[in-house]
Curated annotation (Swiss-Prot):
Listed GO biological process terms: alkaloid metabolic process
Subcellular location: Nucleus
GO terms for cellular component: nucleus
Intrachain S-S bonds: none
Keywords: Alkaloid metabolism, Nucleus, Transcription, Transcription regulation
Protein name, as recorded: Loline biosynthesis cluster 1 transcription factor lolU1
Organism (species): Epichloe uncinata (Endophyte fungus)
InterPro entries: CAT-like_dom_sf (IPR023213)
Induction, as annotated: Expression is induced in loline alkaloid-producing cultures as well as in planta.
Gene: lolU1
Function (record text): Transcriptional regulator that may regulate the expression of the loline biosynthesis cluster 1, one of the 2 clusters involved in the biosynthesis of loline alkaloids, potent insecticidal agents composed of a pyrrolizidine ring system and an uncommon ether bridge linking carbons 2 and 7.
Amino acid sequence: MASPGNHAIVAPGWTRSEDGSLTRPLDLVENWLLARIQRANTPPGREAEGLTYKLKLRLPQDIDDPIPYLRRAWLVFRYVQPLIGAIYPPYSERDETGRYLVTVPLMDPEEWLRLSFHVNQGTQAVFRDVDDAGKIFQPRPTAMAYWFPPSSTLIIRSTHLRFDAVGIYKATNTFMLGLESVFRLGLDANLDCYTTDVKQPSLPPGIDYILGFPPQETPVPHRVERAVDELMRHWHHGLYSLSLPVREGSEDAAPANTQHLVTLFDEPTLEAIVAGCKKLGVSVSAAVHASIVRVWASFPQQQHTGARNMLIPLVANLRPLLDPKWVVPDYALGLCIFVVPFCLTGGFEDLTQRLGAVYSRDLSALPSDPAGDPVSFLELLPLYESREAAFLGSLPVAGCPPFRVPNLSSLGVLERYLARAYGKKGAQAPVCEIEDVALVNATTDPTIEFQLFTFRGTMRLYLYYNDAYYTEDFLAPVMEMVRDSLLQELGLGGS
């Protein structure tokens, strides 16, 4: 068996220390997200953008105590996906030039389990219940797993720097295959005997290396500068975006708890929504986003009469830009997203069609040069990242409305990444099954986060908010308005 701490294939860019740990500088995308986290208004001991991943499981009934199997599966997960054990800022160090580092320590199986796997029960309980686990995100040096026996739910909590939503859903498939293998082979098999979809545990290089970004001192072509200027214009127009009123007296309040609302669309309703979107020639994501904007535009901007536009932060998945060898289960974890701004100006008529046109384009081709030709992310990201950081660091801008536009993360059908059940083919019942999933992104300001995905034939639209700035009594009708707007726009009536 390969040594648990020295088994991974290490890509270029990593440096091995005397103690066996591996380090590399944060890449461009990680630095971009870290800057956002550091700009957030968070009290000491809390972190913006922290992720709480909820995995509700149905496990074999003939296993009296599943905890040893879950612990073993968590260890297998660390073995095949080393980045789950990576240490990011503020817990990692900087190099001699001041660059932030990500560090993957040598794996000590017992220490890994002692520090990162906990059973939330009795006197050892850290959280009151599963919902409580997503309310406040307190950073830890490594990813943490909490098992809730009463609800058969596994909670994974991590800084967003370690993975994005697509990454954790892809890696869930790896974890579940490992868990099924542990049930099948027992607790005493060597780590490399358990089977997952990972061919070889590996540490990927940073995005800078994969995408071949030029050195920082490389001159930027004029056409790229003009394309970045175009993207920045969307941000500047977005300064005059509409917003929802926050609760009275909360404008300068410290963040409290992340809460959520959810509306479900059952299978028949989802089929009707998909058919309605096809008839209009738009994606479901575009139709939902249009409904959110339509509801925001219906609120009077009494305190900020200059608000007239709506910024649409579009999440661009960078994976299609990567060489296929990097888009495999071995490299599922990591940060491969970026936010592209698009600002709606000139009124809010024909929203579904206008947003449908935006969503139908390759997000990486939204910026264009003076001739109207698209400019690839490969060319503009280094310059755009620094320009965007400078802009966001200048907020708030005097005379402009508060900058709190709603975000939508649309993840599609999760069965693209994971299965509903894992077990031996032909068995009467699966070994283990995923009953439900949810991913909470910690909100620490008045920004409202929407998350859209479909699993087990049901589409879920989550709304995440911080209760320092909004109440459930206010937002529950807003959520219902978004639902009704979507159904009415597609000719399906309300609710």
